[in-house]
Amino acid sequence: MTRAILAVLLCASLGASAEGVLPRLAVHPEGHYLMTEDGKPFFWLGDTAWELFHRLNREEAVRYLDNRAKLGFTVVQAVCLAELDGLSVPNAYGHLPFGNPKDPVPAVREGADNDYWDHVDFIVREANRRGIYVAMLPTWGRWWKKADNVFTPDSAAAYGEWLGRRYRESGLVWVMGGDRPLETSAERAVLDALAAGLRRGDGGAHLITFHPNGGAGSSQYLGDCPWIDFHMRQNGHDIDYPADPGVRYDGTLADWRRTPPKPVLDGEPVYEGHPVAFQPDRLGHTVAADIRRAFFWDLFNGAFGHTYGHHSIWQMYDKGRGPVNRPLMTWKEALDEPGSRQLGLAKRLFLSRPFFTRVPAPEIIVPSDPASLVPGTGTRRFTATRDREGAFAMVYAPVGRRFKVDLSCIRTPRCRVAWYDPRTGEERDARIIESAGVHEFVPPSEGELLDWVLLVDAEALLLP
């Protein structure tokens, strides 16, 4: 049976076009960042487009990808076997991924544009042509969990090898998991087999990670797993920085501190327009400020990049489609929500400074008395990052509250300080000060619920 399945799959694995070839991605030798194969920094700015393959037609997919490319996204996260009944509800062209939903053999027909996988090929090609990598989930977690499981280790290995061969030359990252906890040895056997199949199929061309359930990280389940190249977290859909150590954003920091090191990022943070903590009647829906806080909290705690999400876009919600958890608008209307634009601008900030030597720096923030003021708690948590060679430091102030910073981490006697406005991507109020000792800073909107980033650059760097 295994050989028969494998023969069918490998014969059908025609391979996606290599047009728009992107450089391969690799882990930086020091273990905390990703880079391209020629050694350039890679900033992961992802978008959760979970239902992209399943729900959009080609024209809609191009519209979506054009928008994300314009805003500076470098990754879109999409699922081959989608959560929202992806094995029984066809895609926009009436095609299903498998001929039999209980038998995971891809349904492939000869000729172009004749099956589900031709549509996936098209979207992957169009993403790559726009400089966007696809973080491809072979399956949502629903399809390897308990009652809905359709895989055995043998069929998972065959499916993985087929996918690996088909997308070997494409610009992508494999994402295992799919929003579910890894709880049993049987589940682990399926995922191990799927990963091994992917590796055989693509020859090790692509990195692999694991998208966990809410509030967890891949390190919780796969901390020492040899096929995990970098860790992914789902810090989830609440808007606070928890006081409990090791939870959510502190979990990002804990993952950064693991040895041997592996890069870490938040692959599913709080979404824009999402019910806060899944409680819309009590807590309402998130706004762009909530999205910015998650971005800077994760990045300043050691993440190598970040994923954006919008509650209408992950499900590709449109009129006439059943809504999941009260989306506020259609996916088309959500494309230009402020949070997505603001994170695209913030990406430029991180790429404008030395990249591979940036480290978390909670120690440079001088705690107040009481510490609940600074570094603070809840939505008002201050965080910091710095260059380990003293070229720069940054402090994220989520509110207009004065705070103190120890600038002895800066390598030159004088430094340039300025405020970065995360709403506009602009800097203001730049000045030169002495680096030595502790300095107090007052954000431009003191006393207001507006966030700012303090920028500190060594005098030798002096960016315009």
Predicted regions mapped to residue ranges:
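Short solvent-exposed loop/turn micro-motifs enriched in small/polar/acidic residues
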Residues: 25-28, 434, 447
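Aromatic- and carboxylate-lined catalytic core of secreted/periplasmic carbohydrate-active enzymes
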Residues: 19, 263, 271-274, 287-431, ...
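Sec-dependent signal peptide recognition
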Residues: 1-7
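Hydrophobic h-region of N-terminal signal peptides that target proteins for export
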Residues: 8-17
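A short, sequence-level motif marking secondary-structure junctions
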Residues: 46-50, 410-411, 434-436
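Active-site mouth of glycoside hydrolases
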Residues: 22, 27-242
